[in-house]
């Protein structure tokens, strides 16, 4: 499965994409700089499935994910996936790899 795709029946549908960068070459953290889900797939669980895939890949690489949530609604979404707020304004969130 390509990043940003979800298997729906026998078809693979691109529902959105994550963009992840390494803030520095030596660290074990990656910044989730963009997380986009196509409007037609919002509110249907596909964004959660995509973020779950991103988190699983980060866990395999033992990578911390960091990101800025643009709103409390988004912060709540990321919190459901293991991110915690580490700064209030802007809302900076981090997720440590699962053991």
Show the residue positions of the predicted features.
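Conserved acetyl-CoA pyrophosphate-binding loop and the N-cap/start of the following alpha-helix
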Residues: 41, 45-53
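Conserved acyl-donor/pantetheine-binding loop and adjacent beta-alpha core of acyl/acetyltransferases
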Residues: 1-36, 99
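Conserved catalytic-core motifs of GNAT/GCN5-like acyltransferases
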Residues: 79, 84-98
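Hydrophobic beta-strand residues in large extracellular and virion-surface proteins
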Residues: 13-15, 32-37, 50-51, 65, ...
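Conserved GNAT acetyl-CoA-binding A-motif
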Residues: 58-70
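Glycine-centered loop/turn motif at secondary-structure junctions
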Residues: 9-10, 62, 79-82
């Amino acid at each position: 499965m390509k990043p940003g795709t979800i298997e729906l029946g026998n078809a693979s549908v691109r529902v959105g994409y994550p963009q992840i960068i390494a803030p520095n070459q030596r660290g074990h953290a990656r910044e989730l700089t963009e997380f986009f889900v196509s409007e037609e797939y919002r509110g249907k669980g596909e964004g959660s499935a995509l973020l779950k895939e991103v988190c699983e890949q980060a866990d395999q690489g033992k990578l911390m994910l960091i990101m800025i949530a643009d709103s409390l609604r988004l912060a709540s979404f990321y919190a459901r996936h293991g991110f915690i707020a580490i700064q209030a304004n802007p809302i900076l969130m981090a997720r440590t790899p699962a053991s």
